[in-house]
């Protein structure tokens, strides 16, 4: 889908990726979870507008998906919590509860990583798929994501995990599940979406299902503002 937004050469694709990378890096420095998919599409659109060719049908499909991503995360986070908390709360043994969370963390964490790889690797590497091949592009993208997680993700983790809404271990796990389901559905549809937006929506959904309230409305407004700016500042 990304590679079909407009015709890309290796040079224009590199410029698009660099522009998106700079934008996301700046936002990450300030601890704001933003969308790499929206950043790359914005930069690709800028190239397309300059060269006179943008596939507006695909752009419309992407915009609709972007609006639906945080909403979907919120819905799946809320529903998953309401359903799974019933059998979980019936467990009396603290040891069994802790073991259940540990096992579920491994399973849901693996599912979340799989969904991330299935969807988000294409955000950046999609522009190169026609030039260097899909397999090579996917490999490079996967390695780059791993490097980013290890070196530069702490501030965004703290924003999502502690500054939006209060979560316990169980609701945090459910939030990851809600995000993973949302991103995986879009991966099946071949639409690149934002895991950042999906997890923010899922965190809010799981938090409200638990009975929590927003910890800091200013942080949420800051995130929403950054989402809008990411979409348009490169166009």
Residue ranges and their predicted role:
Residues 1-235:
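Multi-pass alpha-helical transmembrane bundle typical of ion/small-solute transporters
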């Amino acid at each position: 889908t990304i590679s079909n937004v407009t015709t890309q050469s290796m040079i224009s694709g590199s410029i698009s990726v660099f522009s998106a990378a700079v934008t996301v890096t700046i936002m990450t420095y300030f601890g704001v979870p933003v969308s790499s998919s929206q950043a790359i599409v914005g930069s690709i659109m800028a190239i397309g507008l300059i060269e006179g060719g943008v596939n507006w049908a695909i752009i419309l499909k992407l915009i609709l998906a972007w609006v639906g991503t945080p909403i979907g995360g919120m819905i799946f986070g809320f529903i998953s919590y309401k359903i799974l908390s019933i059998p979980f709360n019936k467990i009396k043994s603290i040891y069994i509860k802790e073991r259940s969370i540990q096992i579920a963390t491994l399973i849901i964490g693996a599912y979340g990583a799989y969904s991330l790889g299935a969807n988000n690797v294409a955000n950046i590497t999609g522009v190169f798929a026609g030039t260097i091949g899909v397999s090579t592009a996917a490999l490079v993208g996967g390695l780059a994501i791993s490097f980013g997680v290890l070196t530069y993700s702490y501030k965004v983790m703290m924003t999502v995990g502690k500054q939006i809404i209060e979560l316990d271990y169980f609701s945090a796990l459910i939030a990851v599940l809600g995000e993973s389901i949302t991103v995986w559905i879009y991966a099946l549809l071949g639409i690149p979406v934002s895991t950042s937006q999906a997890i923010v929506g899922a965190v809010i959904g799981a938090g409200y299902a638990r009975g929590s309230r927003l910890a800091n409305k200013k942080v949420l407004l800051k995130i929403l503002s950054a989402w809008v700016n990411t979409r348009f500042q490169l166009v």
